């Protein structure tokens, strides 16, 4: 026996037989070892041949295993060192069969045929030989990896026309122009290879699926009728090709099978750019070069699909590119997207077992178009519908909230009951009796609601089963009508179909009044998914949120004292956005806050972020003092190609891509280089910015706040000379126009000059600052009370019209926090104490009281 004459898979089978004999402690390798190894994999080549020969491979495998269990075991010496005479004779016969079949190597299927000729396991040699020849398709074994080339299209391809016949493809709505153009190119004599080019998610693969469905229906010109579209899986072709030349052999077999079909098979390669360089190794030929000759001669019909960016890979090889005809697939319009969603709705309803309302489909198209900027229609709209239906299905299959709440209440009462059982006093016994009654009432209510929910769920499951059956019947009708089998089609179309449609409608009507199960996907469900994906609140306003928006000024005034103009301007912009009246192509609002230091410009931005998002974390703060040089603009939008940090993206663009709904604060903008403002022009006007990598970032759901100290000297001058606020404002605007370009100022929604703080406002700020001190003391359970004199002392010491509220912070630190920290460290103020702060001739006085005064 010359092992070099065997293919790689045949050698592996013999080696594994030896391993099996050794593990089983059998002295010889025999026919059952080889049979068990060959038929172990139900999807392997030997199992397929046995099945094609009309026998069950699993039965033969089980018989081989039982025979192995009966063979005598040896001990003391290592097993599997000899071939049995039966196996040696079978291997000799396999080599002779290879010569008869004109093979250069003994393949795995030849071994199986030799096994069949011994009569092992009841295998019929003639049937196995016929199956072998069918699978080989007239080819001979000329390489060590020949098995990988048998039935290459079946192994490495997916028949889209067969899937269309079985109703496994989603309906393709629209795209008629693209499908017609593909058909036109396929009917050419040479270079009849269309390549679909478009952005990810616009429906390139759907065009090919639409063509497969048209071929099945016969809705194509004569030249395409009866043809098969096979999608080639490049991953399967490459997977497991360990040895040089194995990948090329597989691809060659695919090309040969396609060419031999005499134009009956059209290959479809999704992500066709992967064939350029696929399988390339030193001295090897890549897939693209192997396809060229057959493509040029028109023997190979090929449809490709790739994105605009990745088509460049093919453009690098002009000889390959000229063999393709590009077909551009554009993003569908909103109306077309809604039509597509209506067409595929039924498939999703059947899969999830829920109904999808038409307004939900319209909302999915509109909201995805408006809020999900980095993806394309119809893909993003379909994803929204799919996820909303999955979310509803998950809710339907879990216990309703009302039953959960009752169960939690019952558990709480049961814990209380167990505690009261140990008490003996009359009051506890009375309470125990009340508890028993309440628990019994709860159990009754839970039982009642549980029964209702179970009944509704049962109807829901019946509805899902009926929808699935309806879908199956429609597919069967289509198949019967295509085959002109009217005896089968008529009873289905006029008997079973109307009956099932009526059943589905009746069950849907019964579900309409359901208390616990809501089987309909609505606009609110779609809006909730959009909010979860993007963080943008697009759901309908709840009553609480309406109140909050109407009282937004009061919320902002809690932390920002005075500055009514600025607060009203910001609050109005937020209300316009949430009511849906803002310009859809601009940010929610863009404001320039001017004024002296310490009057609340930055604090207002922080407060707005906290009231919109319940946390200041959602504020993107960019300190413009870091952007004083021209080249620092690249830090905002990302470095250009070829520079360090190109992959990282910009500080501004990346922050907004991750959180499209946020407050962006550009602090101290007058300190930045003038070129930075050129970047902001597009953001303020169109609500978009292109980063260093060419991606468009959407700023339409951001609030942009810029702060500046420009004109501060004029404000100080005006305050000291007693000028009115209006006069100061006019003078500040004059300075502003000298510093910033008109096109920048013209794009801002509002320019607000903050007023200097008055003495009364400082008194209100004292209370806000003290609240922060109280929060820090709360960790030690120390409460703080200040007399009116102490408050007046802090306000008077902290008032400085030129420096705003910041000196007040320093006064509180010096006069209150520092002496207080000394007293805590000295042990004069214990944890849990109540501290009373008064005012004396030398400053603040501290008196620790043991308990808090009510």
From Swiss-Prot:
Keyword Coiled coil tagged: yes
Superkingdom per UniProt: Bacteria
GO CC annotation: cytoplasm
Compartmental location: Cytoplasm
Annotated binding of ATP 1, by residue: 198-205
Region (Repeat 2): 83-147
CDD domains named in the record: AAA, RecA-like_ClpB_Hsp104-like
Keyword Chaperone annotated: yes
Protein name (record): Chaperone protein ClpB
Originating species: Meiothermus ruber
């Amino acid at each position: 026996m010359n092992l070099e004459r065997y293919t790689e898979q045949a050698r592996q089978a013999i080696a594994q037989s030896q391993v099996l004999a050794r593990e089983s402690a059998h002295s010889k390798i025999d026919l059952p070892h080889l049979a068990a190894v060959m038929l172990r994999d139900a999807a392997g080549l030997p199992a397929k041949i046995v099945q094609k020969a009309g026998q069950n491979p699993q039965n033969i495998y089980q018989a081989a295993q039982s025979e192995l269990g009966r063979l005598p075991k040896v001990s003391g010496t290592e097993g599997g060192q000899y071939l049995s005479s039966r196996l040696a004779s079978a291997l000799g016969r396999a080599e002779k069969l290879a010569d008869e079949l004109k093979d250069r190597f003994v393949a795995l299927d030849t071994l199986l045929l030799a096994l069949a000729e011994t009569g092992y396991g009841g295998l019929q040699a003639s049937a196995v030989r016929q199956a072998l020849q069918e699978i080989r398709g007239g080819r001979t074994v000329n390489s060590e990896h020949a098995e990988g080339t048998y039935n290459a299209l079946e192994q490495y391809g997916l028949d889209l026309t067969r899937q269309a016949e079985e109703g496994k493809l989603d309906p393709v709505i629209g795209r008629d122009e693209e499908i017609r153009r593909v058909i036109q190119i396929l009917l050419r004599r040479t270079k009849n290879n269309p390549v679909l080019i478009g952005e990810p998610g616009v429906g390139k693969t759907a065009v090919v699926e639409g063509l497969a469905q048209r071929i099945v229906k016969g809705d194509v010109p004569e030249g395409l009728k009866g043809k098969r579209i096979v999608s080639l899986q490049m991953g399967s072709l490459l997977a497991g090709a360990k040895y040089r030349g194995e990948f090329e052999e597989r691809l060659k077999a695919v090309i040969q099978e396609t060419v031999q079909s005499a134009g009956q098979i059209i290959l479809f390669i999704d992500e066709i750019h992967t064939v350029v360089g696929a399988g390339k190794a030193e001295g090897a030929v890549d897939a693209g070069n192997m396809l060229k000759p057959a493509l040029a001669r028109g023997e190979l019909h090929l449809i490709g699909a790739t994105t605009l960016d990745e088509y460049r890979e093919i453009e690098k090889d002009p000889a390959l590119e000229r063999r393709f005809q590009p077909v551009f697939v554009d993003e569908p319009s909103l109306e077309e997207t809604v039509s597509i969603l209506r067409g595929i709705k039924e498939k999703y309803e059947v899969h999830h077992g829920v109904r999808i309302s038409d307004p939900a489909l319209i909302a999915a198209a509109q909201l995805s178009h408006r809020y999900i900027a980095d993806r394309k229609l119809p893909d993003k709209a379909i994803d929204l519908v799919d996820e909303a239906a999955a979310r509803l299905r998950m809710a339907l299959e879990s216990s309703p909230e009302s039953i959960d709440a009752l169960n939690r209440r019952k558990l709480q009462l049961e814990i209380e009951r167990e505690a009261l059982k140990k008490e003996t006093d009359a009051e506890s016994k009375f309470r125990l009796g009340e508890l028993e009654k309440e628990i019994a009432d709860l159990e009754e209510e839970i039982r009642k609601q549980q029964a209702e929910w179970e009944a509704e769920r049962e109807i829901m499951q019946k509805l899902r089963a009926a929808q699935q059956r309806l879908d199956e019947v429609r597919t069967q009708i289509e198949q019967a009508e295509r085959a002109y089998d009217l005896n089968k089609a008529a009873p289905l179309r006029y008997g079973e179909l109307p009956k099932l449609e009526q059943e589905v409608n009746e069950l849907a009507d019964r579900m309409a009044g359901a208390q616990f199960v809501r089987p309909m996907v609505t606009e609110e469900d779609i809006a909730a998914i959009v909010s979860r994906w993007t963080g943008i609140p697009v759901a309908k306003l709840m009553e609480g949120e309406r109140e909050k928006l109407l009282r937004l000024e009061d919320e902002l005034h809690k932390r920002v004292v005075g500055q009514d103009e600025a607060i009203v301007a910001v609050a109005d912009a937020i209300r316009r956005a949430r009511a849906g009246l803002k310009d859809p192509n601009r940010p929610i609002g863009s404001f320039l806050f001017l004024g002296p230091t310490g009057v609340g410009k930055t604090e207002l931005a922080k407060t707005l972020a906290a009231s919109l998002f319940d946390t200041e974390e959602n504020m993107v703060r960019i300190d413009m003092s870091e952007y004083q040089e021209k080249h620092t603009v690249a830090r905002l939008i990302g470095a250009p190609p070829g520079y360090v940090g190109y992959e990282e993206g910009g500080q501004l663009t990346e922050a907004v891509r991750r959180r499209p709904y946020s407050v962006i604060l550009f602090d101290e903008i007058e300190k930045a280089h003038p070129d930075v403002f050129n970047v902001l022009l597009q953001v303020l006007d169109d609500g978009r910015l292109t980063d260093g990598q060419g991606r468009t970032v959407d700023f339409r759901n951001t609030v942009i706040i810029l702060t500046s100290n420009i004109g501060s000297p004029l404000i100080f001058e005006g305050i000291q000379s007693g000028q009115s606020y209006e006069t100061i404002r006019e003078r500040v605007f004059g300075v502003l126009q000298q510093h910033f370009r008109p096109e920048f100022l013209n794009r801002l929604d509002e320019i607000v000059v903050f007023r200097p703080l008055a003495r009364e406002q400082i008194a209100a700020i004292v209370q806000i600052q003290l609240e922060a001190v109280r929060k820090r003391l709360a960790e030690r359970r120390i409460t703080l009370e200040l007399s009116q004199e102490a408050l007046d002392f802090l306000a008077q010491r902290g008032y400085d019209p030129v420096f705003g509220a910041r000196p007040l912070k320093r006064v509180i630190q010096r006069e209150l926090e520092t002496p207080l920290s000394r007293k805590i460290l000295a042990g004069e103020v214990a944890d849990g104490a109540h501290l009373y702060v008064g005012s004396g001739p030398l400053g603040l006085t501290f008196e620790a009281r043991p308990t808090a005064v009510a």
